[in-house]
Curated annotation (Swiss-Prot):
Bias (Low complexity): 152-174, 212-221, 377-416
Function according to Swiss-Prot or TrEMBL: Associated component of the MCM complex that acts as a regulator of DNA replication. Binds to the MCM complex during late S phase and may act by promoting the disassembly of the MCM complex from chromatin.
Similarity remark: Belongs to the MCMBP family.
GO biological process, one term: DNA-templated DNA replication
Keyword annotations from UniProtKB, A to Z: Cell cycle, Cell division, DNA replication, Mitosis, Nucleus
Gene this chain is encoded by: mcmbp
Quaternary organization: Interacts with the MCM complex.
Region (Disordered): 152-179, 194-236, 375-416
PANTHER family, alphabetized: MINI-CHROMOSOME MAINTENANCE COMPLEX-BINDING PROTEIN
GO cellular component: nucleus
Entry protein name: Mini-chromosome maintenance complex-binding protein
UniProt source species: Dictyostelium discoideum
Compositional bias annotation for Basic and acidic residues: 194-211
Length: 719
């Protein structure tokens, strides 16, 4: 074992940790070979990056271009675990022999994917002196359903961290333009059939052009070299996404189809190599294990992506070696375990340490709360004073103050008066999209809802909604309007068009492909806290096949129980999740929900242009961030059964008695009243209380809930 006192004598500059991390690993290995296996490497790095400013300065990479530009440096990737491969056993170091001098040297093999051999060196394969280790291999994809404002903020933060301040002055000014031009125009095309037709014609034309472009190889593209490395890499990524011979969603195993014309979708998945999987511990001092669908930020080294391979042509032996692009390669490969072809399809990432990200926490500075204070094995992270990182990974009590670093001082936790003001403004903002005031209240509750416990088969806190609309063209754009609203306010959301084709043909339920030994992703493989909009208005007459029936059953199970049964062929694997669902249908919904509401038939929904004008003139980025912070605060506010202070215990006890008496009275008036209804009332009253910044149910909030319910029932009776 390494003597800590001796190790302290090894002085390594902080800049070397950030700019040449592999040099640090090599120095630690040369100092003592045991440093590779006793946790010294990640402990030394944690000592450095536990400083908040240093951690923020580490570049966040997400595209192939960014990976290549930062190759060899310490970088971060933020992603979702889509699959966990079988562990690999590897030697801790390799013996390398100099053929000319017979000198033998040792080289560390951890955190690397290649062996550095000189011309006169060879690898000694029959050496058994090296101790072995098993590394965990994760397949990680870009966080699904992430909305554009999150990507924009991440990019802005990344620019700030890299001292690219020249563009920062335009960030706030471009916020409304981004919403109006990117989100709103997209929705306008979705609603307007004529525009959709024109758009499809343009895309078909682009597709033909891109198809002809992809036939050229990278070796003959001198023009690409003149455009620079960044332009070349973007071209490769776009070729990969738009190639007609392959289904990139299948290759990359994305749960939802991606739009190849959207530059935000140039993000790449990663194969993440984990060398120390006992870094983070729970409150019981047990190592936290990796699970699929979790969002994690890894810190480590990314291997330089190599999109071309040298191979021997099978058709003509006299041609010798030829260079094949990744496009051509993927079109002829039968993709087996993706971990066997990492250099050709997906960049390799060697993780030194990592942070679990809370899927429920976001604000406009950093969309997720990074858990730098989660228990680290050497306890060197506990000095991190970042307010945004004060939450333990497994802490579900939602004691959250990650809005305290908001420079606009829009934290709704300041006082109830400020909170109520923001609440009223947010209701007004929601009404801008859907007009109906009662529906706006229930949408607010849906926005701040989350499952906080699974007990006896119940998902406590689940608040799934059914919205019934008249079979009228006037109301057919409601799903798109709610989609736009959610894209502006939430970090992650997705509208699933429940057309007959999608039900019968689209991968919705993830399943295990035993031939390729991987989980094939589906729509329901999403991180917790992703809001799903189920658009039943797209359903037309036709036959629902067995696959479609399976999809409907899965959506119903998700909506009510918040669980997804992954199809492992011989037996289902039940995965608990939290994907708040909202279904919109003409009349009665095919998807069960915890509540149903009908929109007011007398209202007139706004057009996209009308919303656009309102957003531009009335809502700037600061105001939108205030709404996002309010939702984040309410979603993560610690809720208690009774008052936490002695001064209001009497008030809390009175509320408890009032609730009990009200339920007894309700059962006396209606013999059909069940405990399920009472559970729903408790859930709804809890959301009402949280929306007013109350941490327990008060009598007035219970009465507000009952009043809202009476109005909601009237809308259902009018169906």
């Amino acid at each position: 074992m390494t003597d800590n006192n001796n190790l302290d004598s090894l002085i390594i500059d902080k800049d070397e940790y950030l700019n040449s991390p592999m040099n640090v690993v090599d120095k630690l290995f040369k100092f003592d070979q045991n440093n590779l296996n006793n946790g010294t490497v990640y402990k030394k790095f944690e000592n450095v990056i536990s400083e908040d400013q240093i951690y923020k300065s580490i570049p966040l990479v997400s595209t192939i271009n960014q990976c290549d530009l930062n190759s060899g440096k310490l970088v971060k990737i933020r992603c979702m675990i889509q699959d966990i491969f079988d562990p690999q056993f590897c030697p801790s170091f390799n013996k390398i022999k100099n053929i000319e001098t017979n000198e033998i040297r040792l080289e560390a093999s951890k955190y690397k994917d290649k062996i550095n051999l000189n011309d006169c060196e060879e690898l000694i394969f029959d050496s058994f002196d090296s101790s072995t280790f098993d590394k965990t291999i994760l397949y990680c994809i870009p966080i699904p359903c992430e909305n554009k404002w999150v990507n924009n903020n991440n990019n802005n933060n990344n620019n700030n961290n890299n001292n690219n301040n020249n563009n920062n002055n335009n960030n706030n000014n471009n916020g409304n333009e981004q919403i109006s031009s990117s989100l709103l125009n997209k929705k306008k095309r979705n609603i307007d059939d004529a525009d959709m037709k024109n758009e499809n014609d343009e895309e078909n034309k682009k597709s033909k052009d891109q198809k002809s472009t992809t036939t050229t190889t990278t070796t003959t593209s001198k023009e690409g070299e003149e455009e620079g490395e960044e332009g070349e890499q973007l071209t490769k990524s776009k070729k990969l996404l738009t190639n007609n011979k392959i289904d990139i969603n299948k290759i990359f195993n994305y749960p939802i189809p991606i739009d190849s014309n959207d530059e935000n979708n140039l993000k790449t998945p990663f194969i993440v190599n984990i060398y120390d999987d006992d870094i983070i511990f729970d409150e019981n001092n047990k190592a936290v294990t990796f699970k699929i669908n979790e969002i994690i930020e890894f810190v480590g080294v990314v291997a330089k992506f190599n999109p071309t391979l040298q191979h021997q042509s099978s058709n003509s032996s006299d041609q010798g070696e030829t260079t094949t692009t990744i496009i051509d390669l993927m079109s002829m490969l039968d993709v087996d375990e993706i971990s066997t072809i990492p250099d050709t399809l997906i960049p390799q990432f060697h993780a030194i340490t990592y942070r679990y990200l809370d899927p429920y926490k976001f604000n406009h500075l950093n969309p997720f709360s990074i858990d730098t204070n989660t228990t680290i094995n050497n306890n060197n992270n506990n000095n991190n004073n970042n307010n945004n990182n004060n939450n333990n990974n497994n802490n579900n009590n939602n004691n959250n103050n990650n809005n305290n670093n908001n420079p606009n001082n829009n934290n709704p936790n300041n006082n109830n008066l400020n909170n109520n003001l923001i609440r009223n403004e947010l209701i007004k903002f929601i009404k801008l999209f859907i007009v109906d005031e009662l529906l706006s209240e229930y949408l607010l509750f849906h926005l701040i809802s989350k499952v906080y416990s699974f007990t006896s088969g119940l998902s406590i806190g689940n608040f799934s909604m059914n919205i019934s609309i008249p079979n009228d063209k006037e109301f057919q754009r409601l799903p798109q309007l709610i989609e736009l609203l959610y894209e502006i306010l939430l970090a992650r959301s997705y509208r699933f068009s429940m057309s007959l084709e999608n039900l019968n043909d689209m991968d919705v339920v993830p399943y295990k492909d035993y031939d390729r030994n991987r989980i094939v992703s589906g729509l329901l493989q999403l991180p917790k806290g992703t809001n799903l909009i189920l658009d039943e208005t797209q359903l037309t007459e036709g036959k629902v096949e067995s696959q479609g029936i399976k999809v409907l059953n899965a959506l119903n199970t998700l909506s009510i129980q918040q669980k997804v049964e992954y199809d492992f062929k011989y037996h289902p694997i039940e995965i608990q999740t939290d994907l708040p669902t909202i279904s919109i249908s003409f009349g009665k919904s095919l998807i069960k929900g915890t509540t149903q509401i009908s929109i007011n038939k007398s209202i007139q929904l706004p057009t996209i242009n009308e919303i656009n004008q309102q957003l531009i003139h009335s809502y700037n980025n600061d105001k939108l961030n205030q709404f996002r912070n309010y939702i984040n605060h309410c979603k993560n506010l610690s809720f208690k059964i009774s008052s936490p202070t002695t001064t209001t215990i009497a008030e809390s006890d009175d509320a408890t008695r009032h609730i009990q008496e009200d339920f007894v009275k309700s059962r006396q008036l209606d013999s059909k009243m069940t405990t399920d209804v009472f559970h729903y009332w408790l859930t709804l009253s809890r959301l009402v209380a949280l929306s007013f910044n109350d941490q327990y149910i008060k009598i007035d909030k219970w009465n507000i809930m009952k009043s809202l319910e009476e109005k909601r029932k009237l809308t259902i009776n009018n169906l």
